[in-house]
Amino acid sequence: NLYQFKNMIHCTVPSRPWWHFADYGCYCGRGGKGTPVDDLDRCCQVHDNCYEKAGKMGCWPYLTLYKYKCSQGKLTCSGGNSKCGAAVCNCDLVAANCFAGARYIDANYNINFKKRCQ
């Protein structure tokens, strides 16, 4: 669920508050459209698409609980998750790892969505 995703982000990117990823580019946060502004925004676009796919499986990605571990910045999803738990955990794990490898550009935080995301 979103609370667990927030904690995953903190695991892989402890140096930056999670809310910096909640209003970034065209895809991090409020849904998304248009062309991603950078690699970090592409991480969010992939995450959105992953959640959409999980939804088509009958899952509720924003609410689905799952089990995972964080150890020294490394995430693993537990093997005992339900079908939906496994799918959503994987979506969140891939995104959190992607965030860790992408450059954060301050100018792409809280951008003018109407102008830049068409």
UniProtKB/Swiss-Prot annotation:
Its EC number is 3.1.1.4. It comes from the Eukaryota. Expressed by the venom gland. Pfam families: Phospholip_A2_1. PROSITE patterns: PA2_ASP, PA2_HIS. It is found in: Secreted. InterPro entries: PLipase_A2 (IPR001211), PLipase_A2_Asp_AS (IPR033112), PLipase_A2_dom (IPR016090), PLipase_A2_dom_sf (IPR036444), PLipase_A2_His_AS (IPR033113). The keyword Lipid metabolism applies. GO terms for biological process: arachidonate secretion; lipid catabolic process; phospholipid metabolic process. A motif (Coagulation factor Xa binding motif) lies at residues 52-69. Keywords: Blood coagulation cascade inhibiting toxin, Calcium, Disulfide bond, Hemostasis impairing toxin, Hydrolase, Lipid degradation, Lipid metabolism, Metal-binding, Secreted, Toxin. Negative results: does not bind to coagulation factor FVa (F5) or prothrombin. This is Phospholipase A2 'basic'. It comes from Naja nigricollis (Black-necked spitting cobra).
